[in-house]
Amino acid sequence: MMNRDGKSDSSIVPEKPPNKGTQVAAEVGEGRELAKGNLPECNTPRTLSRSDVPSALRRVCQAARRDSKQRFTALLHHVYDSERLGVAYRALRREAAAGVDGETWRHYGERLEENLQDLSERLKRGAYRAKPVRRAYIPKMDGRQRPLGVPVLEDKIVQRAVVEVLNAIYETDFLGFSYGFRPGRSPHQALDALAVGIWGKKVNWVLDADIRGFFDTLDHGWLVKFIEHRIGDRRVVRLIQKWLRAGVLEDGKRTVSEMGTVQGGSISPLLANVYLHYVFDLWVQRWRRKQAHGDVVVVRFADDFVMGFEHREEAEKFLTELRQRLAGFGLELHPEKTRLIEFGRHAAENRQGRGEGKPETFNFLGFTHICGKTSQGGFTVLRHTMRKRWQAKLQQLKVELKRRMHLPVPEVGSYLRSVIIGHIRYYGVPMNTERIRAFRWAVGCSWWRIRAASPPSSCSSRATCGPRAPG
């Protein structure tokens, strides 16, 4: 999504070229051009490749686009189609962790045709049963642990098939400013939309907000009601309810909640987007059209969103009403992660006049956003790698290097090269060069220190030790 008054920062948009097509209604309402990679035609969704989407599913997409109120009462046959299940299976990560049943991708594939046919038949006659997800944890930047759920392999397959079918409907409904976990969209496009929106519109105040524990507090009752606006096939709705009620298995104990959707399965991001489409997106769109007098910019990525306002009083009014809106659906803004700050083209000048120093910054999708100037002295939004992200990545890298310290130097060098390339691909945006160089240098230093502290026998050659990272 791009502001029509400015040019896209194309260097941070993924390499995939944009689709050709007409604007969808949501983005016309945004007053911006069509997003690169958005889906105006019904030739996809891209959770799977275009060639894997049969004409029957394209007809579902076309019907959804023609009538925004149509409820689809016959969808399950798209889900239990053996070919679609096979494509879903092959799209899974081969080395992904197994669920509570221990079934792996490779073992399941030894009798793939027979297993998929059996799965299809169970789905068809209503005998399919969802299993609890296995609890796993990954570290967060603040040192805490983020809980995830690992579904069993067959649940992964069926969820992916359901997501493909439902995307054919919901991708015609979702609004242009929603970017998180959608086919053909990416964090870089959200960053692009935000930067161009702040630069091209009369933005003077920025609301940086986060919904507290969204994935844990999402209300199942409301979610089912929202789904039933479009999905009239009770068999598909029951499938979703089975996953919601399957529970979590941790230390041999199964727990079930009437709230939340476990992060880890492919269905959770779609359910989150459906929930926020009705709770947040449609409401924000209506508020902006009917109550805002100045410019308003909005970009949402899952439960994290940033909004730009021309007038402070409108931003404060919106924030008050947003809290009330979310409370009606069991949600609340995170008090420590929600801020209204002066940010925009005139922020530095205004704050200097009041003796308040430089404008505050805000973080979004791994970048710290800063009011800056171009080489010609014009206003621009600078984006630097978040310090916490930078430090957390280096800390993880040190742990991994210690684990690999006895491996041959070329093998470790190849690993570090992949780390640096991956970092550059995400954080390599204009005017972030110094942070990129600093990261590369820090990676090299970490490797050099660990090798210098290791016994000579642990390295095949010590002549190449030094402070520079490989590649």
Question: How would you label these PLM feature ranges?
Answer:
Residues M1-G471:
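Non-catalytic terminal/accessory segments
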